[in-house]
Amino acid sequence: MEKTAIKNFAIEARKILMRSAEVQAGLYGVTKNGCSNPIQKGAGFEVYQTVAGTENRIYGEDISKRRDLVDAVNEIGFAQVMEKAAYTWFNRLIAIRFMEVNDYLPTRTRVLSSATGSKTPDIVTEYREVNLNLNDEDLEKVQMCIKENKYDDAFEYLFVKQCKELKRVLPKLFKKTDDYMELLLKLSYINDGVVRMLVDTIPECNFNVQDEGQVEIIGWM
């Protein structure tokens, strides 16, 4: 078992997910300095000024998710919410990696990698055939992302859908999370980050039960 590699990954992944969550929160006017009010709002939409000074217009469910995020920050603090988000998504990434390597996923389709060795995860190339209970709106969203070459957006959307489906069969492992957690997630299989680190730097044998592989995540503090 590559304990050193696993330890280094766990430490770096935590930092990356924490920073990413903070950046995502900033897109909704939520920072360690407070939660801003919308600079504009109307029927079904709100506009927030981001940390970078740009404007972010949100609609529908994202409005209620943002409201829940603000409530959580006010209740337990900004740092604690970011830590919770990082910890939650880290655990799910590890669980899904373990399941896909051992072919334990109900869909039998890899989520973070490809059985062919391609950099593009199988869930992105085979989403039409994968049973994730995607409705027409879901399919349209994924198709639009791919059409616009926003492959990471399609990947992240499908990853979240997979987590929700796994909650049905593994409710203890994939407990229902606060919906605002989705606002704090930003994943990429194309660029360097947690997914590439997990797939490229931790040998599959460390996850494969047939090779007596078992992951011990060290340094998650």
Region locations from a protein language model:
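Preference for the N-terminal adenyl/adenosyl cofactor-binding alpha/beta module
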Residues: 1-221
